[in-house]
UniProtKB/Swiss-Prot annotation:
Region: Disordered, residue numbers: 455-474
Tissue and organ expression note: Mostly expressed in flower buds and leaves, and, to a lower extent, in roots and stems.
Protein name stated in the entry: Structural maintenance of chromosomes protein 3
Entry's Gene Ontology molecular function annotations: ATP binding; ATP hydrolysis activity; chromatin binding
Domain of life: Eukaryota
UniProt: ATP binding residues: G32, A33, N34, G35, S36, G37, K38, S39
Effect of disrupting the coding gene: Altered chromosome dynamics and cell division during seed development, leading to aberrant mitoses and giant polyploid nuclei in endosperm as well as arrested embryos with a few small cells.
Location of the motif Nuclear localization signal 4: 799-806
Intervals of motif Nuclear localization signal 3: 650-657
Self-association state and partner proteins as the record states: Cohesin complexes are composed of the SMC1 and SMC3 heterodimer attached via their SMC hinge domain, SCC3, and an alpha-kleisin subunit SCC1 linked to one SYN subunit (SYN1, SYN2, SYN3 or SYN4).
Species annotation: Arabidopsis thaliana (Mouse-ear cress)
Primary localisation category: nucleus
């Protein structure tokens, strides 16, 4: 084993982490300038090996931390890596890392990263060969110097330390201490024995007086016993009488208490009922307010609907009257229309005839006037034109103008014909449009009627659904009220059960529920109280039998219970007892065949899989009719028995009983919890079903209302469309009338155009006929005759035309009046009256009135229902009020009964207190006389009956006389005999103890002798080994020299003349009163091999250092270590000895495989080193690097020249 590597961080001058290269397993040398950190490097290794820096205080730890520039180092560590290939450390690893970390508040060791204690480190190092008795595997600066200055006695102490004689000395000192304590005890024992002997002589003289005293004392005790016994018997008789009276009063008090308790329970029950009734009454009052509000609302709605229906009826009656009036007016207007049409039809032909006559006359007049004009023009052509050609030219021009006029009139004629044709087409289209709209109106009116019918149907369905919803609301309210009531009772029962459950058990059960939920643990069935049920009359028996076992939790197997217990412990969540079904077995019990004793287990209801758990708790218990039966069964059948009242008789003989408060029954609370939980679940399911039905009804109502709104919107739209279509028909009729007017006007214009065309054509034909004729200045006879006839004829025609015109205007005026009356009055009035009649016929008033009447019927039904409901609520209020009054009366009676019972109870309590006080007095008296009898001590057999027949007064007189006689012996030591016996026993015991101490003293003396012998043997053995190795090592270090170690004895001191002046040889060693055999170790050496040997004080400094080194190497050879640390051991050596030391180290490393780590300022150790490390220092921070041998020698040479 050897040190493989050293890692330092934050330790003294080593700030940053420094990890050395692996050390050689032979010779390693460390060089560096003074103050560079070589010694700190050695201190770091010793810091881990714990030979220094063992018990560090805070300031010591702070001194080990690096102090320099930059941030402060708060912790440091040194880690040594050991090569353990030879397994010197008892660890199955080839490499071991031992680290020591130090901080301001810590000092820890780590082995391969795991924390270990300081003691474990020391044991580990000792197991590897590091002896606490031999610390010379580390030689620090100054150790050599101290060895050179050692006195002979100090060298002897060194040998003792190396040889381990300290153990012998410690054991010897402990033995001497024990001997001293034993001597002290022996002295004390001798003094006590001497005192006891004197007291025994005195007590022997007092025994005779004591005998006489004892005879009188025997008589006194006998008298006192008889008096005490009689008094005790009297007290017991009185106590029995008091107990009988107290039992009777207690029974009566119990009855009164039961009556008070029953009255209180009944009162509480009445309070609960009163509370519920008050709550129900408040609910009824609220319901009454709601129903009254509904009734008021229904009455308002009914009144409004009645007014609406009356309004509709009035409007319908008015519409019927209006329709009749309109029909009458329509008939009148239609008759007038027919008359006007007939008159118009009669006038039209006459008018047209007159117009035709007028037109024909006008046409004839125009023709004649034209002829007359032509004749006049022809007659004046000769004067107008100079020749025929000019005339023809003019005629041609006239003909062309007429032709243009003709063309223009022809175009106008064609245009008028086209317009008339278009107007006729428009008229036909308007007729078709009107027919189409009338068909659409019929369809829309049919659709409106169907929508009204469907709307009324949907309304009835909606009203029915609303009625159903109202019923469901009532059910929902009722269920919610019942659930709230059940939950209140459930919470009360849970709270009462919690109060009846021990606190740690309650917390445990709550913790189990959370643990099972959080960690998803299955197989937990719950406490027994939740798994068992029975008839209510067995509740007391079951609870008293089980006790807190009712809260034992049944689980499927013990793995589950183990897991839960682990969680309970970690959470500190209370305590619970588990019953794993895979572990428990129900006991096999033979029950008695007795009708008065029934197995309790048979009266329980539970799941068969829980039978082992319940059998373990209740299997050995039977329910008995009374305590007599229970006592008999428990004794004969070895079973636990219990009565229905909860009185127990154990099979082991014990009896337990008394009052049991049934109001705190755990099973009753659990029964309420289970039943209410079941009822709540059922009610909540019903409530959920009702709410689901309400949701469906709400959806249906919403759907029906939506459908009603759609139908209402549809018929409203249809009405708007009908009105629009009727308006379009009216507009079309107006347009038809306008078109008729336009056609008449266009036809008249067309007739005028055609007349003008004929006139133009006639004029053109006349002018064309005149062309080419001769130009004459006079007319022909025929023309003159014609001219003479034309004027009269024209005049006559004009007169006729005037007559025709006058007649035509008259007829035209009448015709216009008729047409205007028909068009603007009669037709409009007919249309209006028809529209009025149609609106009355098509009016939705009857339908709306029917709807309103239906709504009125519904409103009347709602009013009746509200009245019935209000009456029902009022009846319920009256009933609840009567019940409340009845409960209050019952409460008053119960209060009176309770007060009477409490008064009786107070009297009984007072009587019981008096009896109890008397009982305590008698008990105290009984205890007093019992204690007095016991205080008399053991009595002779005749003492019980000697004075039995005497009365108390005689006994007291006799006792008085006996007491007077005893006063004569008042000076007698009453404990003389006891003291004599006691002192005799104490003397024998002390004498035995003295003998034991004497024997122990001899054994301790033998042990001290053995220890002294073994100590001397150890010193001699160690000295021989060290002396032998010293001679060898000295001869190796000093050529031709020799040296010896001489151990000095007491006899040598007296005969040694050579050392008379030696200051270290004249002290006599004394250890704990014993003169030591050895008093010192001398060193005698010769460096030349010739002449006499020299003592240490006769040597030079270098020679002393050689001797000290030889002694160190000798000690090391006696107790070899795996490696050695030398810190500048060659500092004071002469060069030839430094070479010898280096060669010795080299030889030890090669021959024995020992590792050396040395520091030096000299070249000799560097030359023999296998690996050399340089320590450098910069900015108060040290680092360690491997350097070559030449670099090390150069550094040493420069350092020595610098020192020079």
């Amino acid at each position: 084993m050897f040190i493989k590597q050293v890692i330092i961080e934050g330790f003294k001058s080593y700030k940053e982490q420094v990890a050395t290269e692996e050390f050689s397993n032979k010779v390693n040398c460390v060089v560096g300038a003074n103050g560079s950190g070589k010694s700190n490097f050695f201190h770091a290794i010793r810091f881990v090996l714990s030979d220094i820096y063992q018990n560090l205080r805070s300031e010591d730890r702070h001194a080990l931390l690096h102090e320099g520039a930059g941030h402060q180092v708060v912790s440091a560590f040194v880690e040594i890596v050991f090569d353990n290939s030879d397994n010197r450390f008892p660890v199955d690893k080839e490499e071991i890392r031992l680290r020591r970390t130090v901080g301001l508040k810590k000092d820890d060791y780590f082995l391969d990263g795991k924390h270990i204690t300081k003691g474990e480190v020391m044991n580990l190092l000792e197991s590897a060969g590091f002896s606490r008795a031999n610390p010379y595997y580390v030689v620090q600066q100054g150790k050599i110097a101290s060895l050179t200055l050692m006195k002979d006695i100090e060298r002897l102490d060194l040998l003792k330390e190396i040889g381990g004689t300290r153990v012998y000395e410690e054991r010897r000192r402990e033995s001497l201490r024990i001997m001293q304590e034993t001597g002290n005890k022996r002295k004390q024992i001798i003094e006590v024995v001497h005192y006891l002997d004197e007291r025994l002589r005195e007590l022997d003289e007092e025994k005779e007086e004591l005998r006489k005293y004892q005879q009188l004392d025997k008589q006194r005790k006998s008298l006192e016993y008889t008096i005490y016994d009689k008094e005790l018997h009297d007290a017991r008789e009185k106590l029995e009488q008091v107990e009988v009276a107290r039992t009777k009063a207690s029974e009566e008090s119990t009855k009164m208490y039961d009556r008070v308790e029953k009255a209180q329970d009944d009162s509480k029950s009445l309070d609960e009922s009163l509370k519920e009734l008050t709550k129900e009454l408040q609910t009824l009052y609220k319901e009454k307010e709601t129903v009254e509000a509904q009734q008021t609302k229904a009455l308002k709605k009914k009144t409004k609907l009645e007014l609406d229906v009356k309004d509709f009826q009035d409007r319908i009656t008015g519409n019927i009257q209006s329709k009749n009036d309109a029909l009458e007016q329509l008939n009148t207007v239609e008759r007038e229309m027919q008359d006007s049409l007939r008159e118009l039809e009669a006038i039209k032909p006459l008018y047209e005839s007159q117009v035709d006559k007028e037109n024909q006359t006008s046409k004839r007049i125009n023709e004649l006037e034209k002829t007359l004009s032509i004749l006049y023009q022809k007659q004046g052509r000769a004067t107008q034109f100079s020749n025929k050609a000019a005339r023809d030219k003019w005629l041609r021009k006239e003909i062309e103008d007429l032709k243009r006029v003709l063309d223009s009139n022809t175009v106008q004629e064609q245009k008028l014909q086209d317009e008339i044709l278009r107007l006729n087409t428009d008229l036909t289209e308007r007729d078709e449009h009107i027919k189409k709209h009338e068909v659409e109106i019929g369809e829309l009116e049919s659709r409106i009627s169907k929508s009204h019918e469907l709307f009324n149907t949907k309304k009835r369905e909606r009203d029915e659904e609303q009625r159903k919803r109202k019923e469901k609301w009532g059910e929902e309210s009722q269920l919610s009220s019942e659930i709230d009531k059940l939950k209140t009772e459930l919470e009360r029962a849970k709270k009462n059960l919690d109060h009846a459950t021990p606190g740690d058990v309650r917390r445990g059960l709550n913790s189990i529920r959370r643990i099972c939920a959080d960690y998803r643990i299955n197989g937990v069935f719950g406490p027994l109280v939740e798994l068992v049920d029975c008839d209510e009359k067995f509740f007391t028996a079951v609870e008293v039998t089980a006790g807190n076992s009712l809260f034992n939790v049944v689980v499927e197997n013990d793995d589950i219970s183990t897991k839960i217990i682990r969680h309970l412990n970690s959470l500190k969540g209370g305590r619970v007892t588990f019953l794993p079904l895979n572990r428990i077995k129900a006991p096999r019990v033979n029950y008695p065949k007795d009708s008065d004793a029934i197995p309790l287990l048979k009266k329980l209801k539970f799941d068969s899989k829980f039978e082992p758990a319940l059998g373990q708790v209740f299997g050995r218990t039977v329910v008995c009719r009374d305590l007599n039966v229970a006592t008999r069964v428990a004794k004969n059948d070895d079973l636990d028995c219990i009565t229905m009242e909860g009185d127990q008789v154990s099979r082991k003989g014990g009896m337990t009983g008394g009052f049991y408060d049934h109001r705190r029954s755990k099973l009753r609370f659990m029964n309420i919890i289970m039943q209410n939980t079941k009822s709540i679940n059922e009610k909540e399911k019903e409530l959920e079903d009702v709410r689901r039905q309400l949701q469906v009804i709400d959806q249906q109502i919403t759907q029906l209302v939506t459908e009603q709104q759609r139908l209402e919107a549809d018929w409203t739209l249809c009405k708007l469309q009908v009105e629009q279509l009727k308006q379009e028909i009216a507009n079309a009729n107006k347009q038809k009338h306008a078109i008729h007017k336009a056609i008449e006007y266009k036809e008249k214009l067309l007739g005028d155009i055609r007349t003008r065309i004929d006139q133009v054509r006639s004029s053109m034909s006349m002018k064309e006929a005149e062309m080419g004729t001769e130009l004459v200045d006079h007319l022909t006879p025929e023309e003159r005759e014609q001219l003479s006839k034309l004027n009269p004829e024209i005049k006559d025609l004009k007169e006729k035309k005037f007559a025709y015109q006058a007649d035509r205007i008259e007829r035209e005026t009448r015709k216009a009046e008729l047409e205007a009356n028909i068009a603007t009055n009669l037709k409009r009035r007919i249309t209006e009256l028809q529209a009025t009649i149609a609106s009355i016929d098509d009016d939705s008033l009857p339908s709306s009135a029917g709807t309103k009447e239906q709504e009125l019927d519904d409103a009347k039904l709602s009013v009746n229902e509200a009245a019935k409901e209000l009456k029902s609520v009022c009846d319920s209020i009256d009933e609840k009020t009567k019940q409340i009054k009845k409960i209050k009366d019952e409460k008053a009676k119960l209060k009176t009964l309770e007060d009477d019972c409490k008064g009786t109870l107070q009297d009984l309590d007072k009587k019981l207190e008096e009896l109890f006080s008397l009982r305590n007095t008698l008990l105290a008296k009984q205890d007093e006389y019992t204690k007095k009898i016991r205080g008399l001590g053991p009595l002779s057999s005749d003492a019980f009956d000697t004075y039995k027949r005497k009365n108390i007064k005689e006994l007291q007189k006799m006792l008085h006389r006996c007491s007077e006689q005893l006063q004569q012996f008042s000076h007698v030591n009453k404990k003389a005999l006891d003291q004599y016996v006691n002192f005799t026993e104490q003397r024998e015991e002390l004498q035995n103890r003295q003998a034991e101490l004497d024997a122990g003293d001899e054994k301790i003396k033998e042990l001290i002798t053995v220890l002294d012998q073994r100590k001397d043997e150890s010193i001699e053995r160690t000295f021989k080994g060290v002396a032998h190795h010293f001679r060898d090592v000295f001869s190796e270090l000093v050529q031709d020299g020799y040296g010896n170690l001489i151990i000095m004895k007491k006899k040598d001191l007296d005969n040694d003349d050579e050392d008379d002046d030696d200051d270290d040889g004249g002290r006599e060693a004394v250890t704990e009163g014993r003169v030591e055999k050895y008093i010192g170790v001398k060193v005698k050496v010769s460096f030349t091999g010739q002449g006499e040997t020299q003592l240490m004080k006769q040597l030079s400094g270098g020679q002393k250092t050689v001797v000290a080194l030889a002694l160190i190497f000798a000690i090391q050879r006696c107790d070899p270590a795996p490696f050695y640390l030398f810190d500048e051991i060659d500092a004071a050596l002469d060069p030839q000895y430094r070479t010898a030391v280096g060669n010795l180290i080299r030889r030890l490393a090669d021959d024995y495989g020992t590792q050396f780590i040395t520091t030096t300022f000299r070249p000799e150790l560097v030359r023999v080193a296998d690996k050399i490390y340089g320590v450098f220092h910069k900015n108060r921070v040290s680092i360690v690097n491997v350097i070559s041998k030449d670099q090390a020698l150069d550094f040493i040479e420069k350092d020595q020249s610098h020192d020079t």
